[in-house]
Amino acid sequence: PLCVAIILADLEMDKETIAAGLLHDVVEDTVMTLDELTKEFGLEVSFLVDGVTKLTQLNWDKDKVEIQAENLRKMFLAMAKDIRVIIVKLADRLHNMRTGQYWKPEKQKEKARETMEIYAPIADRLGISKIKIELDDLSLKFLKPEVYYDLVEKVDLRKDAREAFVQSIVDEVKAHLDEAGIEATVGGRVKHFFSIYKKMLKQNKTLDQIYDLFAVRIMVDTVKDCYAALGVIHEMYKPIPGRFKDYIAMPKQNMYQSLHTTLIGSTGQPFEIQIRTYEMHRTAEYGIAAHWKYKESGSGQVAAGKEEEKLSWLRQILEWQRDTDDSKEFLSMVKGDLDLFSDSVYCFTPSGDVKTLPSGSTPIDFAYSIHSAVGNKMVGARVNGKLVPIEYQIQNGDRIEIITSQNSKGPSRDWLKVVHSTQAKNKINQWFKTQMKEDNIIRGRDAIDRYCKA
């Protein structure tokens, strides 16, 4: 419990959350009751402890879809009541994984798989990279120990040469930024093992063929300084076309903001530079934990201000929960939404609003991301002013206009073969379920009418 509290303190959580981390096992492992805990530490702490206890008692039987789906329902409901419940649980899971060497091999794999499928993606969606990154690496360590230790050995083998190269870049960049009058902190880091492994899988390459094993990070005071620093960097090194990403203008769904650019160094070796403000760095490290403010709301707490808007994905999952009776379907939707390997594409509405969709999405996905009524009445789409087929794959920066008609009979089942987002699939399936129900009601009434007339 003390280690969990220390992790929460490192995230700079409020005193009630840290207390809940310290006490999260008390009700389950001692004779102390929840009522006694409330009298001793207050309603807020006991509410958090109770929420964490209920999550701890969940049994993630990988062979039983209904149990997994029900557990996910309970977890997301707990998050909706108070996001700090899941933050305490993430800290608890991180501590468990850190001490996982004492588990039997079967339990190591079971817990690692559960962590990789559920807890690490949730930490990612909450933007808490400090926890997410370590959970990923520890999961890889227990699931594929031979891969993990091979990576550790090979990365360590080149450590001295790599550190010397990174330091030369850091010194060179810092000198040019100083000369341009931009105050900045510049540092370098090796990418994490799971990140490297994922890149190897995605690109079907060996470690020797992965060139950007490290990144240089520049931190400045203002957004204006971010773009000024980018200008300096692009004058110093040759940028690789197609490898620039502006997450400041178009933040990720988990609040992450930075400029990413991949460059060719003076030795011909490519490397990545990330540029962000100090506030953006804090958000990248701590995510929702860096911003969460609370106001009294009955027995729990709710997010204040704009931070509540950052959890739109959670509200989406709760909507699926209400709309979906099928456990297998719900489980598939949630895991698809939390998919660690999914990349995003950023596009625009006709009014200039940014929409973030999974890579590979089509205009149908875009239509349903606006509203189910738009998707259900869609008859075509224009991308950048030109008509496109419905299976067109949206590219970054596309401006999309959906053409609708009140005469549309609704979506086609063939759309399910085309759409890429979980949200669109769910809304299309929901439309057909509603239609079937209405058709059955009409058939039933007709049958009764015929029977009465006979």
What residue ranges belong to the model's regions?
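Short active-site segment of divalent metal-dependent hydrolases/proteases
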Residues: 27-28, 95
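Active-site alpha-helical segments that house and flank conserved acidic catalytic motifs
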Residues: 17-25, 88, 122
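Short hydrophobic/aromatic beta-strand micro-patches
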Residues: 219-221
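Short hydrophobic/aromatic-enriched beta-strand-loop microsegments
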Residues: 17, 48-49
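Internal insertion modules embedded within essential enzymes
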Residues: 34, 43-45, 51-214, 226-231, ...
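Alpha-helical phosphate/pyrophosphate-handling elements in metalloenzyme active cores
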Residues: 1-21, 28-36
